[in-house]
Every structure is written in C-alpha cells, then in structure tokens.
Amino acid sequence: MKKHLKIIPICFLSALLFNTAKAQAPKKDTINVGTVVGLMRDSAHNYVMQSATMAIYKQHSNDLVSYQLTNNFGRYQFKDIPVGIPLYVVATHVGYQSIKKEFLISPKTKSIDLKTLNMERIDLSLKEVVIKGQQAPMQMHGDTLEFNASAFKLDTNAVVGDLLRALPGITVWADGVITVNGKKINQLLVEGKPFFGGDNKIALDNLPKNSVQKVQVYQDKNDPDPINPKTNMNIVLKKDKKDGLFGKFGFGYGSLDHYAGDGMLTYFSPKTQVSVVGAFNNVNKIAGNVDELMRFNSFKGDGINDDYHSDFRRTGTNIFRGGGATFSQDFSKDADPRQSYYKTNQLRGEVFSSDLDNKTLTQSQTVVSLGDNSHLNQTSDDTQHSNDFSLRSNGTYQKRTEHAEINADYSVNNSQSISQATQNSTSLNDQNQDQSRNFAQQMATRNATDASGSFGINTNRYNNWGTQKNRSINAEFKYTFNLTHSNEDSKNITNFTATDTTQDKHFNRQYVKNIDGGTHTFVTNFKDITGLFQRRGNKFLQIDINNTISLHHENENDKVGDLAPGATTYTPNRDLTNVSHYKTIDDKVGVFLSKNFWKTLDNRYSKSWRVYVNLQGQIFDQKNEAQQTFQNIKRSYSYFIPAADFTYRNDQYGEFSKNYSLGYYTSVTYPTISQLAPLVDNSNVYSITIGNKGLKPAYKHIAYANYTYYDQKNKNPLNYKIELSANLVKNNIADSSNYDDLGRSVHRFINTSDSRSADYNGWLEKAFNFKDHQLQFSTNSGYSYSEYTTNVNGRDYLTRANSLRANASVFYTYKSIWQARVGENFDGSKSNQIGLSRFTNYNWATNLGLGFALPRSVFFSTRVDLNNNKTSSADHNIYYTIWNADVGYRFLKGAEGEIKFSLLDILHQNKSLQNYITANSLTTTTANVLQQYFMVTLAYYPRHFGLHKKKE
C-alpha cells in the first residue's frame, strides 16, 4: 500500500508533463506545416527514453518553434511544424548529455522521420553534438515537472502571472485560481514557502518574470488525504533575485471633494517577509486586513475586475482609514523546496487597525400577510450615524519534522463603536384601517475585546526497520479558546401612538450591559489503533478514536432603568435588570472506521476507494443561573450522531480525473436561553420575543452526493463539479408570530412538524488557448427547495420556499494586452405560504468589461453593470446602470510611475435596493449610496529585486 502511495505522484506528474508537452507553441498555417517523428534511446543500454524533452528551433534565429516530451515508449511526434526552412531539435534529459539534430521538412512530403537518437550519460564521451547552455523549455526532475523561465520571451515588465499564462497546459483563471491541465494548484509557493499569506494574486502581480529561474509542479507527498492528494506550484527565483522590495504610493483627488490615498512597502528575502500598508478615502474603498490592501496595491492590480474600485453596493457615506503590517520569519535550514513540508519552522504575525465612519439614510416598505386577505403595510424611515474602530493582531507558528508537527496561533481584537439612530415607522391594517406610528431614538457606545487561539500537536507513527518495531503513535492533540469581554451603554427613547389612544406608550430606557464569556475546546484523536499491533502495513480496518469536548461560559450583568415623564433620574427596571451565569458542556466521542484501496499502473492510471463510518455520540449539558428566577434552567441531552462516506477516485493519466462521493451525517441544534427564557423588553413595541421552555432540540439528517471532473487531455481544460444534498429535520425549530391590528407582533419559537430541504450546487469552467489568445468560460449555479411549517396568529401554514442563483461569464485575454468580459447573474427567491401569502423577488445583472494595457504605455479599462430588479409587491421593474471607466499612463523606468483618470457612475444611476422575504412578509429597502464622481490619481510603484546579489 505504501508503495502505491509513492508511485501515484510520480505517475501523475509524468502524465501531466506528457500532456503539458502536447499543449505546444502556436499552431501554424496547415498548408505550410508538416510533422516530425522519432525515437529516443539510452546509448549504453538501448533503453527507450521516457519523458525526454524535445524542443525544435529555427536555425537562423534560434526561435523556439515547439516542444514536447517523449511518451512511455520513447517516441515523439510534432505536428504543425513549418516546412522548407532549416530547423534543429534539441533533446535533453536529467543525467544525460544534451544532443542536437539539424533537419528540414520537405514541402513535398511534409513529414520527416529522425529515426533513433541516442542519448549518453553525462560521464560518457559524447558522439552526437553537445549543446552547451541550451536550456529545455521544460523537463522532469525526479517526480517534479519544471519549466525554465528563460525559454519564454516576454515584455521586460512582465510579472509571474504573465509567465504562467505563457506556459503550456497552465491556465490562470480570472479569479486567480491556477490549474495545470485541469488539475487545481493547491498552493502557489515562492522558494518553497507561502508568499505573504499564500494569496496567489500577490505573487502573480508583483514578482517580475525576469527574476524567475524556473517553475516547479509537484504533488504534495505528505497530504493526509491519499485519495485526492493536492498539487503545489513553486516559483524558484534566480540566485541574484532572492530578495526584493516592491510597493505603491498613490493619492487621488476628485469632484465633490472625494479623495483616496493608499500605500504599501513590501520586503522579502529567503527567510523574511515584511509588508507595511495603509489607506484612507471617502469613496467606499474598504479593506479588512493587510492581505486585502496588498492585493489591491499590486503592480498589475488594475484591470476589469474592479478589485479596488469604489464599492457602489455599500450603503451610506463612508470615510475609511486603515493600516497595518505583516511579517513572517522562516527559521528552517535551507532545503529542497519540494521537501519543505518536513522542514517548516515559521512564525507569522499581523497587526491591522481600521476606523470607519458611516452615515446611512434608509427607507423600507414591508407587506405582512395575516390571512383572510388581511395585510399590514408598514413603512420606516431610518437615520443612522456610526463610528467603528478596531485594532487587531494575530500570529501563527508552525513547526514540522518528519514525525511530528506543532501549530500555534492567536488573535486579539479590540473594538470601539459609537452609534446614533432615529426611526420613524408606521403600520396600517388594510382591512380595518387601524394605524399606528412609532418614533424611536437610540444612542449607544460599545467597547469589546475578543481573543482566540489554539495550540496543537500531531505525531506520526513510523517503523524502526532495525528492530521492526513501531515508534511513536498517530495522534492529534489540540486546544482552542475563544474569549470575549464587552461593555455597552445605550439609551432608547420610544414614542408609540395609535388610532386607539389607550394603546399609546412612551419609554425612555437606559441600558448598561457587561458580558464576559469564553469557550475552551479540547480535541484528542488517536489514529490507526490497529496499526500499533502490526509491524508491516495495515491489512485491516483503520480505527481512530476521537473525542472533542467544548466548555462554554457566559456571565452577563444587565442594569436597566426607566425615566418617567418629568423625572430627572432613572428608576431601576426590575424585570430587565439581571445577573446571569450560563454554562454548557458539549462532548463528542466517536470511533472512526475507514478502509482504503488502490489499483495503479505506472503512467497509465490510478484508482482508489475509501469507505469510512464515524460512530459518534454527543452529550450536551446546559445550565443557567440568574437573578430572574424564570431563567434558571438545567438540561442534559444525549444523541447518537453517526456519519458515513464512500469516495471513489479514477485518475486516467493524460485523459481525466473523476471523483465520486456519497455520504450521510447527522447533527443536533439545541435551544438557547434567548429561545427558552429571554428577558422581554416591551420598549421594542413592534416586535417582542417571548420564551418557550418546552422547546426541544432539532435533529438533522443530511445525505449528499458529489461528482467532480478534471480534464487532463489537452491545453483546453474542461472542469466541473456537481453537489447534491437532502436534509430532513425532526422537531424543527420555527417562528410562531401573532400580529394585532396595530402591527405589533409577538414572536415565540416552537417545534413544528418535520422540515425538508434539497440543495444543488455546481460549477463548470472551460478554457480555450490558441496562439497568444485565451478564452475562458465559467458558470456556477445553485438551487434550494425547502418545506416547513410556520404559525401565524394561531394557525399552521405549510411554507414552500425556493431560491435560485446562476451566473455565467466569458473572459478573453490577448497576451497581457487585451482583456474583455461578458457576464450574466441571476438571483431569485419565492416563498409560498399555502393559504396565506405568496412572495417573489429576483435580480438580473449583466456586466460588460473591456481593458487594454500597452507595454510601458497607455492603459484603459471600463465596466458596465446593467441591473434589473422585480418584486411581487411592486408594479414595475426597477432598472439602473453603473458605468465606470479608467484611462491612465505608465511612465518612468520599469513603468513605475502612473497617472490615472477615473470616471465613476458615469450615468449617475447607482441605487441601493434590497429585498428580504420571510414566510409571511416581503420587505423592500432603499438607502443613500455613493454616486457619480471623477478622480485623478498619481501613483509610484517602487520595485527593486536582487538587493544582495549573488553570482550565478
């Protein structure tokens, strides 16, 4: 079995390389092209030479014409090779002398057989022609596929992303995902290490092509999933380009006093990575961490994707200020990057601060169905001003050896928020015309500190071949914690009036809330217990024993007071003032049984099967002690929550990879204190939630089936995935609502009859490569159907809900000069409460994009989004268009300077329109948004690579 595991990566990459070779240089005119065939052999033993690199060049210019690898039988066949001109072929293989053979294809025969070429080992005298300094475009190095960057000529300002797009069989998709002949790259590494957190875009858009020595593709031998091992890509830099400095400093000013500034300075070396970033603007460019700002400030960061354009979907007017730094330090000794898994010894940290000021004006309209053709028509006008500040730091440490792994991480976030809000609401019953109004004001300040972290140790059993005894054990030990502390002071002023004046209510209520809580989780997993009693291999079931226990506590202190009319001091509210201590214990114990099977044939196929069953039980205890005695609750539950899965993988090297999986698992949702016995605040006049101590846990059954296909046949990959699932929930927890004629509602959670749902998700992507052109087609879609029971005004209604989302896009690129995109997006939902209500809502969006960038010169990009919205409560569709455009010029050496003119929301049509559907209501909300402005931006991109140059 272990032998099979070692063979699989080698077979896979050999086949991958062979097919990469078939994705050759650009096709020629079929009238003036021919074929070249031949055979490669080892001169000493007369073996056929597998995976030898064959490259054809023009004699007069040494331009590369085409290249490929020999197959399992040492043969090669070139098609579409120009006829009637002098050519030569260069053959290379690791451990052998390179050889050269000159030839010319006759225009009459349009084919030539080069017969047998013999390759000699490096330590033998050379009888054929030796080619010194001639590098093959690609080759096999052990089980690693290598591309030589110098064999591919690109613009002097090209970056790694441009290089990868020029490599045969490699596709860089529009979202940054990389595939090699359809196989998704799990990690893009630089010098065997993640590059600034592992975001592909940072390496693709910043590292220059001329700093790259080679690109390696290999399977992760140590992937814990033997059925579906992951594939990595490693960028090897030239010896004199191992370190570098890059960044951006930019500022823009535009109409209506709009402004935007951002900066980044990044340094990397073989052991150290450091980046400092910052941004400030009032044009809805908001980032949540250092990685986002690094991605937005990339050297080739602009295009038609609108990664760092204004977010016109964000509501309100926003002023953002943020900045931070990230660093990583590698303490491991220098080693082959392909073996870096066992050499990992890395520390990484980040600190990030953000300050966001938001002012939002919102209008909403809600239609609530009450049955018997009765409806509530509710409107609301809201004004909110908030300021949110946060300071977050986090760090990770990882160390791996051949038989053990240590992981540790932490995160601390301090946040402060100040908010003020006013709300004017009305409710009208269309049957009896009863009407009510509510005016509410809220002022709140909140300070919170959240901390989390984990520490884990994994050990691997290995065999001492001298004593034939097992050493160590396969085990996982992990501890995680989440802690929170918050203080909140707030005041609510409410004035409720109605046509029936006896129902008028007035509140001036003050709240002081303090919360301290935390969760501590301990994971213990002993793997492959049966292997402890066997010396060689494991011929029986693999048995794992696992236990996960979580201890949660939350202490809450609420002080609530009311200010009576004419009074000057707040009187304590005895119903809402409370001290509570909530604790839960969640313990899951299981026995995990699994069995793997393999069937392989070198360079042909690999088939694998895996079956597992997880026999797991769960014990859940909850206890709440409170000053309000009705909240004193103590409950214990125990459930059997099994899971099972069958996975089959079929890799036909050079053809396809298929993955099938079928499975079933269970889970339990337990009632919370806020559902069982909440504190009822009657100042929330329009919506009050009361408790239900009879609420039972909901038990969920989930069955699923997945199918994934990856094409490995040619340079035009087709990949797709289909996911199906079905859910059945026993004792489903649902909302029970009671409305009065004034629009006031009382909500209560209840257990209803079984709920059912079914879901579909899928995606497909196809790429076409021809010469310097690439066309990408991608689509993904999802559908969800559910049936459940709700209760409105004491009557049960069967509710059927549907939702559908679908999008498709076509993305075209020509070299790194032209880009174009056309896309369609649909998102719709429907809710049908049998005998009560029917609501529908959908959004259509069409987006068009075009961009070009002349080398070291002018660039232009534009994007148009056409939006169409329709709801069942509106008489007409709502249409609006967002059109943005940029034109700019790159100057200075290395295109390090930039001036850009941006036109945003050119048609001045941007709107914020959102729809929410519940079982018996439909809400449409509009808000103020950022609209048309123009801006001029200046930017400088410092770029220096090879700060401490070493000789090759």
Which functions belong to the PLM regions below?
Residues 60-75:
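Short, acidic Ser/Thr/Gly-rich low-complexity loop/linker segments typical of extracellular
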Residues 24-30, 105-133, 232-236, 935:
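Extracellular beta-sheet/turn segments enriched in Thr/Pro/Gly and aliphatic residues
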Residues 70, 198-201, 219-259, 272-952:
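Primarily recognizes Gram-negative and organellar outer-membrane beta-barrels
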Residues 58-63, 85-102:
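A short, solvent-exposed loop/turn motif at the edges and junctions
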